[in-house]
Regions:
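Active-site histidine-anchored catalytic micro-motif
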Residues: 1-103, 108-121, 125-218
Length: 218
């Protein structure tokens, strides 16, 4: 596949002390020399894995970094159905961070909007307000009607392991799928890619749990 290399700048190209030209020239040099296929990000003299990078700062040139999250998923080659030449359809997705005080009515409003998948940002290793029976019931109902429910960790260096605490196990039993050590950006992009390719919920869940391009395996 043709490599995709993304770059940009923290200051406009015409501003004094801009990093735009250094990033652009550096990115072109990387392309000229050749690098691993796939999506990469070049910023501040660093070549970063596109499926692992996050923006951590808004006030410095080293704004992007790869987070060393635990990634232990089984790797699988990208199937033809998910190839970059395949057309994609629009997908209705949502992201919701869990927080103390989250009400079931908030979740109901989101699910009633017709989302096909919901990415929940859970506490730590994959816990949340699991003592809220109404909220859990809403998740179970959404899962039963075909909504793909996935969970990432809110921690910058975390991963979702539902079996560590009872609270996490209850979320898993309500239908949530662990994103393992994927970042929010990677998990969201993966959901867009899987569902946008026309895969059904069950098939999308199967591929979501596998590592396809280094997003969830070292």
């Amino acid at each position: 596949p043709i490599p995709v290399l993304l770059t940009g700048s923290m200051r406009p190209a015409g501003a004094t002390g801009s990093d735009a030209w250094d990033n652009l020239v550096g990115a072109l040099r990387v392309l000229q020399e050749g690098h691993a296929r796939g999506v990469q990000v070049y910023f501040n003299d660093a070549l970063l894995h596109g499926a692992r990078v996050s923006k951590l700062r808004s006030d410095a040139f080293d704004a992007f970094a790869e987070l060393p999250r635990p990634r232990h998923a089984e790797h699988a080659p990208v199937p033809a159905a998910l190839g970059y030449r395949q057309p994609r359809r629009e997908v209705n997705l949502a992201v919701l961070p869990l927080y103390p005080g989250l009400r079931a009515a908030h979740l109901r409003g989101l699910l009633d909007s017709g989302v096909e998948a919901l990415l929940l940002e859970c506490y730590g290793s994959g816990t949340g307000p699991s003592d809220d029976e109404e909220l859990l019931a809403l998740l179970r109902e959404a899962h039963a009607r075909g909504v793909l429910l996935a969970a990432v960790s809110q921690c910058a260096y975390g991963q979702v392991e539902f079996g560590v605490y009872a609270a996490g196990s209850r979320l898993r039993d309500a239908g949530l799928l662990s994103a393992g050590g994927m970042t929010r950006e990677a998990a969201l992009g993966k959901l867009f890619g899987l569902l946008g390719a026309g895969l059904g919920r069950d098939e999308a869940q199967r591929w979501f749990a596998l590592d396809l391009c280094g997003e969830n395996a070292d």
